[in-house]
UniProtKB/Swiss-Prot annotation:
InterPro entries (UniProt xref): EF-G-like_DII (IPR053905), EFG2 (IPR030851), EFG_II (IPR041095), EFG_III (IPR009022), EFG_III/V (IPR035647), EFG_V (IPR035649), EFG_V-like (IPR000640), G_TR_CS (IPR031157)
Protein name, as recorded: Ribosome-releasing factor 2, mitochondrial
Span of chain positions assigned to the transit peptide in the UniProt entry: 1-22
Annotated GTP binding sites: 53-60, 117-121, 171-174
Domain tr-type G: 44-322
Homology family: Belongs to the TRAFAC class translation factor GTPase superfamily. Classic translation factor GTPase family. EF-G/EF-2 subfamily.
GO biological processes: mitochondrial translation; ribosome disassembly
Record flagged with keyword Transit peptide: yes
Keyword Transit peptide: yes
Principal localisation: mitochondrion
One GO MF term: GTP binding
């Protein structure tokens, strides 16, 4: 093996030792053997990761290279050839984009890596949210020529919500316009992170030929003849060596401000020269785990450069399952897991992707959800995109697909039995010994945060089968697809007697239609797309309501008084705190009050103008009388009727969805695009330079003004500009625009 020797005249002794110790890699072919699928791996040897990026960032290509180098595939899958492992849907291969997240597993250096490849398009952001519930860390991929893009910010925020450590891989560094330093600046400015580059690009004659591994002080180059399977480390000399030394000093300087052990060594020796290489690596890992830094790597997955070093970094710097999720320790060695996704297979039926946090899930096991539903695990499969290999169990820290559960949905907590749930809850909240069954799910959700964040629909449209004989089959298909994709909203409009779909965008709904045809053989028609407006109150309104009815010989009575008003805090249901109100309300049982709350929140889902969800609106309950023997469901229905009655007399306004546009264009097309945006009620946020010839424009734009906007931009810029968009809140419509929106919704415009 080649031992890297350093130029003594330019490199201090301590740094020489770090470089000399680490850079002992030469040309070699990795042995792809690892733990067999039947072995029970130690949790410390497992990594559960998600691959995140803006659309066309190179997620799927990077994933395919990982599978190839790990020996799981014999041929390099290419998105443009439609032969990738993880893009298996017909629609994915036709369009060249990822629509559904796909799970694959491979072995690398005696570790098991469970990887989820996720979509990059904003319309399928729910797939990203589902995937993040099953992983312990992420790799965020940037296009080296585009930097931090709109959807990069979105997926980064999602990873922040899940408190996931992450690495960044700056991909497509083979492009002439790639700018590694620019990407580092954008990571820090747009995402507010401390980006620590552990590599530098090697550019010769304008082409990426390899990378400099700063920690080892080696230039690494890949063999083009065998698709980059083998690579070698070359000693650094002259200017490259000096630059690597400077970068290493910068890394140690950053880490010493965060890692006490590293800082102590430097203080005691009054120098960075005595820092041992293993201490540097340990500090990088510790700071990454605490999300204090983001290690940055580079390469070109398509050109087979840098991927193996990224795979090594996943093992070195991202956490093992037993280094996270400490809250699940309350379950001890009993089985507990989470459903992160549900899919449907024609032969196997519904399959639930389960992440096991503690214990072991075995074939034939009886489990329950936190909602109290009992399920049986009939079969267990190791995930491999759309192919499955049956296994006998899933150990702690791993993921697997389970056949058998009929009612599980994304976000469900699943455990061995009811007593396990009870014991865990007691450990988490010792004061909750007397909790009722109806409340256990909410208590566990508040402690374990297992509710999935489902984004609001942006568009909706009607859906019709080719004939009434297909209606039952269509309803069943929509139930299955909605179980897979919680961001798809399905409702029934009693006025038009039509089924209505709500989705994240035009593409989302087009894919739903295509899937119904290809998977269920139903050629449905979609109605015109409508904007999913929301509603809000201009001023509070107060009213009372009495609901009285006899059901099966039992008299049902609910009498209440409520106010609907602007939400002051996060809570959407409040109790009047006046002494008079409190004297009345404290007579109501907690279980009954929970149904009053549910009824109030249900009523806030449909406003009086266009049936849009009410934003920033709360309900305050003043007085409540419940007749003896009144059913809980009647209480909930009566409350919803009361709130709707009060809303009908309140002054409401429409709010329209706003999109954040990010456009990249040659500088000469900036003014025509600005002029066009001015006609669309847009708010220009900023215009920045990217390189010498391009501009990046960010603007807030009403969704109603953006129909086929991508096509318009291509026409204005002669096909040279790109545009991406993501939801960015809601804004109040003017009275004139509101009237126009109502006319359009009723088909009058």
């Amino acid at each position: 093996m080649l031992l890297l020797l350093c130029n003594r005249s330019v490199v201090p002794r301590g740094i020489r030792r770090i470089l000399r110790t680490a850079a002992t890699v030469t040309s070699l072919r990795w042995n792809h053997t690892g733990p067999s699928a039947s072995e029970t791996l130690l949790e410390k040897n497992i990594r559960n990761i998600g691959i995140l990026a803006h659309i066309d960032g190179g997620k799927t290509t990077t994933t395919e290279r990982m599978l190839f180098y790990a020996g799981k595939t014999n041929v390099l899958g290419e998105v443009h050839h439609g032969n990738t492992v993880t893009d298996f849907l017909v629609q994915e291969r036709e369009r060249g984009i990822t629509i559904c997240s796909a799970a694959v597993s491979f072995d690398w250096r005696d570790h098991r890596v469970n990887l989820l490849d996720t979509p990059g398009h904003i319309d399928f952001t729910m797939e990203v949210e589902q995937s993040l519930a099953a992983v312990d860390g992420t790799v965020v991929i940037l296009d080296g020529s585009a930097g931090v893009e709109a959807q990069t910010v979105t997926v980064w925020s999602q990873a922040d919500r899940h408190r996931l450590p992450r690495l960044v891989f700056v991909n497509k560094m083979d492009k002439e316009s790639a700018d590694f330093e620019g990407c580092l600046e954008e990571l820090e400015k747009k995402l507010g992170v401390v980006a620590v580059p552990l590599q530098m690009p090697v550019i010769k004659e304008g082409k990426l030929t390899g990378v400099v591994d700063v920690l080892s002080g080696a230039q690494v180059v890949w063999d083009k003849q065998n698709h980059g399977r083998t690579y070698k480390a070359i000693p650094l000399v002259d200017q490259q060596l000096v630059e690597a030394q400077d970068k290493l000093y910068q890394i140690i300087d950053v880490l010493s401000g965060m890692d006490d052990g590293l800082a102590q060594v430097i203080i005691e020796s009054d120098s960075m020269d005595n820092v041992k290489p293993e201490l540097v690596a340990s500090a990088i890992r510790a700071c990454t785990m605490k999300q204090q830094i983001v290690p940055v790597f580079l390469g070109s997955a398509y050109k087979n450069i840098g991927v193996q070093l990224l795979m090594d970094a996943v093992l070195k710097y991202l956490p093992a399952p037993n280094e996270r999720n400490e809250i699940y320790n309350c379950f001890g060695s009993d089985f507990v897991g989470k459903i992160s996704k549900v899919t449907h297979d024609k032969q196997r039926g519904p399959l639930s992707l389960v992440r096991v946090f503690r214990g072991t899930l075995k074939k034939g096991a009886k489990i329950i959800t936190a909602k109290g539903t009992s399920e049986t695990i009939q079969r267990i499969y190791a995930p491999w995109a759309d192919e499955y290999r049956e296994i006998s169990s899933i150990s702690a820290g791993n993921v697997g697909l389970c056949a058998g559960p009929k009612s599980t949905v994304t976000g469900d907590l699943v455990v061995a039995n009811a007593s396990v749930l009870r014991n865990a809850l007691k450990k988490l909240s010792p004061t909750n010994d007397g909790v009722e069954e109806d409340d256990i799910n909410e208590l566990l959700a508040s402690k374990l945060s297992f509710h999935t964040v489902v984004p609001d629909a942006v568009y909706f449209c009607s859906i019709e089968p080719p004939s009434s004989s297909y209606q039952a089959a269509l309803d069943a298909a929509l139930r299955e697809i909605q179980r897979e994709d919680p961001s798809l909203r399905v409702s029934y409009d009693e006025t038009t007697m039509q089924t209505v779909l709500g989705g994240m965008g035009k593409l989302h709904l087009e894919i739903i239609k295509s899937r119904i045809l290809s998977e269920y053989k139903i050629d449905v028609d979609l109605g015109p797309l409508q904007i999913a407006y929301k509603e809000t109150l201009e001023e509070p309104a107060r009213g009372s309501w009495t609901a009285e009815k006899e059901i099966a010989g039992s008299k049902q009575l609910v009498r209440m008084e409520v106010t609907v008003h602007a939400k002051r805090k996060d809570e959407r249901f409040l109790l009047d705190s006046s002494p008079e109100a409190q004297e009345n309300l404290r007579m109501i049982r907690p279980r009954q009050m929970s149904y009053v709350r549910k009824g109030s929140l249900a009523a806030l889902e449909r406003g009086p103008k266009l049936g849009g969800q009410l934003m920033d609106v709360a309900v305050t309950l003043h007085q409540l009388t419940i007749g003896k023997g009144t059913a809980d469901t009647f209480i909930m229905a009566a409350t919803a009727q009361c709130v709707r009655h009060v809303l009908s007399s309140a002054k409401c306004r429409l709010m329209e969805p706003i999109m954040l546009l990010e456009m990249v264009m040659p500088a000469e097309h900036l003014n025509p695009i600005l002029a066009d945006l001015g006609k669309r009620r847009c708010e220009i946020l900023d215009v920045t330079a990217r390189g010498q010839q391009h501009k990046v424009l960010r603007a807030n734009a009403p969704l109603a003004e953006l129909e086929d906007y991508s096509s318009e931009v291509r026409c204005i810029s002669s096909g040279t500009a790109s545009v991406s968009m993501e939801p960015n809140g809601y804004a109040l419509l003017s009275e004139m625009d509101e009237a126009s929106a109502i006319r359009r919704a009723h088909g009058l415009e």
